[in-house]
């Protein structure tokens, strides 16, 4: 979507509603913020942006501040309204989105940038015993597990299986 093809109303600002505060949502908001004819609202369930490349660091005992950047800081100086809430209902006919607090947002254009979720592929027990490191909460849960195993249970010879050979998997295995 370019700013040229969504600025059709001259009497009022064109309302762009972005749902999702991850990479795609933040990039869209920052890119569109330069157009003064747009009114941009970013709805995110979290007040921070989870920077995936640093989540492994937070999971293995490092500071979570490098992996968790406040959205207000990322949008500083830009004309982007940030709403910390969760989308609940979408009415495409009336072009509205309702969030869990009950607020209703009207839009002219909607960008759904909701991210991804971990797929456990129906493998029995995997969801119960695996840790995903896609969120700050997931990284924190893994960090607590590591602390419990290494410090409280005095088990320095713990073995882990890392599923995924992407950047996060490689960085995590190196950190462990």
Language-model features: locations:
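Beta1-alpha1 glycine-rich phosphate/pyrophosphate-binding loop at the start
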Residues: 2-81, 160-161, 170-176
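FAD-binding core/adjacent interface of flavoenzyme oxidoreductases
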Residues: 1-13, 79-161
């Amino acid at each position: 979507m370019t700013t040229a093809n969504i600025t059709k109303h001259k009497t009022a600002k064109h309302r762009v509603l972005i749902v999702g505060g991850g990479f795609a949502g933040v990039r869209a908001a920052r890119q569109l913020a330069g157009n003064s004819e747009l009114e941009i609202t970013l709805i995110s369930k979290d007040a921070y942006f989870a920077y995936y490349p640093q989540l492994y660091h937070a999971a293995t005992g490092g500071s979570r501040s490098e992996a968790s950047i406040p959205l207000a800081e990322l949008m500083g100086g830009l004309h982007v309204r940030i709403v910390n809430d969760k989308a609940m209902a979408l009415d495409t006919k009336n072009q509205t989105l309702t969030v869990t607090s009950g607020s209703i947002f009207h839009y002219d254009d909607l960008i759904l940038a909701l991210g991804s979720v971990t797929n456990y592929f129906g493998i029995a027990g995997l969801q119960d015993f695996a840790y995903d490191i896609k969120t700050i909460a997931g990284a924190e849960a893994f960090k607590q597990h590591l602390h419990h195993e290494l410090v409280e249970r005095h088990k320095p010879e713990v073995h882990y299986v890392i599923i995924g050979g992407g950047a996060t998997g490689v960085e995590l295995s190196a950190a462990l």
